[in-house]
């Protein structure tokens, strides 16, 4: 989702805010495109910044990639919340639970606009915790007699870590 930023940053000279992992990934893209990284600003959940008349509040959410945040944009006419893509996971692998309390606080105060993005949100039911995937890996690694092939997004760092941890547990080799 950050592939366009090197092109935008060539045209617009302004600060670019992101969490450490996001900016780390972006730095590789910038280098590939000959764009400097002096405008990058690291933020973390709980950070607040002011940009002109806007006050931004970064709120922890869960997603397949670690270090994800939503942004509450407090404007003179009301608050806009942009969630980015997120997943509700009450038991995330890294223990960093989504800040439900912050969303509730903003809800109590009133939100002008919620821009929410959650893959498969239109499907009924819920998505199990990423920890459940780890338990499935454990079962597969325990009983598999031959090679195991796992496909995942490269950004799904927690899933990749669970594969590696499970492979170590069962004395298996990992090839990426």
Where are these regions (language model features)?
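His/Asp/Glu-rich metal-coordinating catalytic cores
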Residues: 1-176
